[in-house]
């Protein structure tokens, strides 16, 4: 389904750099015949991993064609691969899933039995991720000129990591990237200059990191051409941080000295080269702007040259759009790429479109993609009636239809169900474009957390035991994610049944214990976001209707 390419027509511009032209031509090359690229990718994956323990089970005998692969290798979920992943995690270095050594695990925001899923990664995966990153600014430059004349204020953070019993790092995908040489030793690029120094981004103390990044952004406010964070919720947390700390930030700027709250040696040393003298004029400006009760349009007041916000506002993040519009004065919101811990998938070729119109073009060189037609009768029905012969190739999906994404990666995931539900919106050349609809089976989500019905049910059951001895029990509950507060939080409504009125009405002390019990019962992603990252606020637990018998 080839169409006239807007990228191709824009590439003839005299202002387009040679580097950008090369990147845009690569996108055109990959999307003209995605089926051919996909065939090559699958062949490479199966050839290099033919001697792995996993693939040997299916008697491929060196055959790498798609028909044989799809007829012999089953579609799987994380639970199916858990034994193999556990062996690798424990230190088994034999070629179980991949012929290349597994160098680390990327922790997924999805969970299994309450703990983060571990996605195997090989060293060259960093190169693939870097390749996708390298395509983002060439596309953006087609729509927003002059980004090389200033800087980006991006609030970027590393999250806590651990090591498996076998000694492999286990950490979120962006933490892995920020700590890699690809990021730390990235060559100078005028289109990718950040106000935040690496020392602040790499600080594991999120409070010190945020303070230093915000201070740098304020000191360079006239140079800032774009603001961003990974998620919309992250940018709103930065605004909330400014609301709570602008007096201290203004004092640092006024005196030319760094707050004592910054004690990380690397940040202190770096900031001594940035905060070099008092700036009374800037400090007075900040006090004047931030002391106002109305913060509508605060972003463009402080950073007047900002052209757009670079944040994810699709899926669960769409709930933050109105608040971002309020604080930004209606700035465009750019969603630039689609990625996960399993693999990086694609890019938005129209990054300045409305959030409701965001579609991602899958780059066929990143992995081998299949699509399971989504059953609208419900996820349970779709699970029960899985027909592996119904999976559709990347080039054969149909506009308007919804699919669940299934991937095969170089690192050793074969026909793995990612759990993302996508809708086909069109094509770029012959490559399909998808709108992210939702994450499968997710009931509650504030940021990167994903809580399903079973997890919430277990948490409610555990908490309800605290007052069962008094003869009170939960007969009904409902929930929602409250995102009008920053940070957002879960709200759970309970309908209680007690022996009498005094039993049905719970004290604040008991409610507090119930909230704590529920939070401790939720998955590890929620607990980390709640305690370490502070990206989720305290649980709101409310007794709605009390009944007694």
Swiss-Prot record:
Identification of the protein by name: Indole-3-acetic acid-amido synthetase GH3.2
Tissue: Expressed in flowers, pollen, cotyledons, stipules, true leaves, hypocotyls, and all parts of the roots except for the primary root tips.
Keyword Ligase: yes
Family note: Belongs to the IAA-amido conjugating enzyme family.
GO biological process assignments: response to auxin
Tagged with keyword Translocase: no
Keywords: Ligase
GO molecular function: indole-3-acetic acid amido synthetase activity
Induction, per UniProt: By auxin. Down-regulated by blue and far red lights.
Pfam families attached to this UniProt entry: GH3, GH3_C, GH3_M
EC number: 6.3.2.-
Role played: Catalyzes the synthesis of indole-3-acetic acid (IAA)-amino acid conjugates, providing a mechanism for the plant to cope with the presence of excess auxin. Strongly reactive with Glu, Gln, Trp, Asp, Ala, Leu, Phe, Gly, Tyr, Met, Ile and Val. Little or no product formation with His, Ser, Thr, Arg, Lys, or Cys. Also active on pyruvic and butyric acid analogs of IAA, PAA and the synthetic auxin naphthaleneacetic acid (NAA). The two chlorinated synthetic auxin herbicides 2,4-D and 3,6-dichloro-o-anisic acid (dicamba) cannot be used as substrates.
Top class in the EC scheme: ligase
């Amino acid at each position: 389904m080839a169409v006239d390419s807007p990228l191709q027509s824009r590439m003839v511009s005299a202002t387009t750099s040679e580097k950008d032209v090369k990147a845009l031509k690569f996108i055109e090359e990959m999307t003209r015949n995605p089926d051919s690229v996909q065939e090559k990718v699958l062949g490479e994956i199966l050839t290099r991993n033919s001697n792995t323990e996993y693939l040997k089970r299916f008697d491929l005998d060196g055959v790498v064609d798609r028909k044989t692969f799809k007829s012999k290798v089953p579609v799987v979920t994380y639970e199916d691969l858990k034994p193999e992943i556990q062996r690798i995690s424990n230190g088994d270095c034999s070629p179980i899933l991949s012929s290349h050594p597994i160098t680390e695990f990327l922790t997924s925001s999805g969970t299994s039995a309450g703990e983060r899923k571990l996605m195997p990664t090989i060293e060259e995966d960093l190169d693939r991720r870097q390749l996708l990153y390298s395509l983002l600014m060439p596309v953006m430059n087609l729509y927003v000129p002059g980004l090389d004349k200033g800087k980006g204020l991006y609030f970027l953070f590393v999250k806590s990591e651990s090591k498996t019993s076998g000694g492999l790092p286990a950490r979120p995908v962006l933490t892995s990237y920020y700590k890699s040489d690809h990021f730390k030793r990235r060559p100078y690029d005028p289109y990718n200059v950040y106000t935040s120094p690496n020392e602040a981004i790499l600080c594991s103390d999120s409070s010190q990191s945020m303070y230093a990044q915000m201070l740098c952004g304020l000191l360079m406010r006239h140079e800032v051409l774009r603001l961003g964070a990974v998620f919309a919720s992250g940018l709103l947390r930065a605004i909330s941080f400014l609301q709570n700390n602008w007096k201290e930030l203004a004092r640092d700027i006024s005196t030319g000295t760094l707050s004592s709250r910054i004690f990380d040696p690397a940040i202190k040393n770096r900031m001594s080269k940035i905060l070099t003298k008092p700036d009374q004029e800037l400090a007075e400006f900040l006090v004047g702007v931030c002391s106002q009760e109305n913060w509508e349009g605060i972003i463009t007041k402080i950073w007047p040259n900002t052209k757009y916000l670079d944040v994810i506002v699709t899926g669960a993040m769409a709930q933050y759009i109105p608040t971002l519009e309020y604080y930004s004065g209606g700035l465009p919101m750019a969603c630039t790429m689609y990625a996960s811990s399993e693999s990086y998938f694609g890019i938005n070729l129209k990054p300045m479109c409305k959030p409701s119109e965001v579609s991602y073009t899958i780059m066929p060189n990143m992995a081998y993609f299949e699509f399971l037609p989504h059953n609208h009768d419900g996820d349970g029905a779709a699970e029960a009636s899985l027909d592996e012969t119904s999976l559709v190739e990347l080039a054969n999906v149909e506009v308007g239809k919804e699919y669940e994404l299934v991937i095969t990666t170089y690192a050793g995931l074969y026909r793995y169900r990612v759990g993302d539900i996508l809708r086909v919106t069109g094509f770029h050349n012959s490559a399909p474009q998808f709108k992210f609809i939702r994450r499968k089976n997710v009931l509650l989500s504030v940021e990167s957390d994903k809580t399903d019905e079973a997890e919430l049910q277990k948490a409610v059951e555990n908490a309800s035991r605290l007052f069962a001895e008094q003869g009170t029990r939960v007969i009904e509950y409902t929930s929602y994610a409250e995102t009008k507060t920053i940070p957002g939080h879960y709200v759970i409504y309970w309908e209680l049944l007690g022996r009498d009125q005094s039993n049905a009405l719970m004290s604040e002390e008991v409610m507090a214990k119930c909230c704590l019990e529920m939070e401790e019962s939720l998955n590890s992603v929620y607990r980390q976001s709640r305690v370490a990252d502070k990206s989720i606020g305290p649980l709101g637990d409310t007794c709605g209707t009390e009944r007694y018998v």
